[in-house]
């Protein structure tokens, strides 16, 4: 039986982080969580991290596709917040963003960390972007680091 698993150190990895400007005060916390994990746990150097600010969550799949086809990055982290309103706009944006990022990841065999918060209210968004715990940006960064290493192991195994 073969078991493949990996750690989260990827000190030579090149990472792009796409961050949504809308709800920036929440997304700044997600970004800080992702950067903390990349540097402290993944040992990723500043010069290997690119941050791209986009207008809204709906734009995340497009920028992720552009980053993927550039072949400059080993992984992408998508960060944003969609808060439920009184229209179906929330469901539309969340679904399109989620399915778009998943499709791009699979089509390009490229890890994309899903750090898109979908919450009922601002309190939930603040809680899930916590500085000390429950930061979904941190979780997305950890997933990307591990998947970068797992994909390398699979590629290099015979």
From Swiss-Prot:
Residues bound to (2S)-2-hydroxy-3-oxobutyl phosphate: 128
Keyword annotations of the record: Riboflavin biosynthesis, Transferase
GO MF entry, a single one: 6,7-dimethyl-8-ribityllumazine synthase activity
Binding, 5-amino-6-(D-ribitylamino)uracil: 22, 57-59, 81-83, 114
Catalytic reaction(s) noted: (2S)-2-hydroxy-3-oxobutyl phosphate + 5-amino-6-(D-ribitylamino)uracil = 6,7-dimethyl-8-(1-D-ribityl)lumazine + phosphate + 2 H2O + H(+)
Pathway: Cofactor biosynthesis; riboflavin biosynthesis; riboflavin from 2-hydroxy-3-oxobutyl phosphate and 5-amino-6-(D-ribitylamino)uracil: step 1/2
Domain of life: Bacteria
EC number(s) on file: 2.5.1.78
Disulfide bridge map: none
CDD domains given in the database record: Lumazine_synthase-I (cd09209)
PANTHER family for the chain: 6,7-DIMETHYL-8-RIBITYLLUMAZINE SYNTHASE, 6,7-DIMETHYL-8-RIBITYLLUMAZINE SYNTHASE DMRL SYNTHASE LUMAZINE SYNTHASE
Recorded family membership: Belongs to the DMRL synthase family.
Subunit-structure text: Forms an icosahedral capsid composed of 60 subunits, arranged as a dodecamer of pentamers.
Protein name as it appears in the record: 6,7-dimethyl-8-ribityllumazine synthase
Organism encoding this protein: Blochmanniella pennsylvanica (strain BPEN)
Gene: ribH
């Amino acid at each position: 039986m073969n078991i493949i698993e990996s750690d989260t150190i990827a000190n030579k990895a090149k990472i792009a982080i796409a961050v949504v400007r809308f709800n920036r005060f929440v997304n700044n916390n997600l970004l800080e969580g992702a950067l903390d994990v990349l540097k402290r746990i993944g040992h990723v150097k500043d010069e290997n991290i690119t941050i791209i600010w986009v207008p809204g969550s709906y734009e995340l799949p497009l920028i992720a596709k552009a980053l993927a086809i550039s072949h400059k990055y080993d992984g992408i982290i998508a960060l944003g917040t969609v808060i439920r309103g009184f229209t179906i706009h929330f469901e539309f944006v969340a679904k399109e963003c989620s399915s778009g990022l998943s499709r791009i990841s699979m089509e390009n065999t490229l890890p994309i960390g899903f750090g898109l918060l979908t919450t009922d209210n601002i309190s939930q968004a603040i809680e899930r972007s916590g500085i000390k715990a429950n930061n979904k940006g941190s979780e997305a960064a950890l997933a990307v680091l591990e998947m970068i290493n797992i994909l390398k192991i699979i590629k290099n195994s015979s």
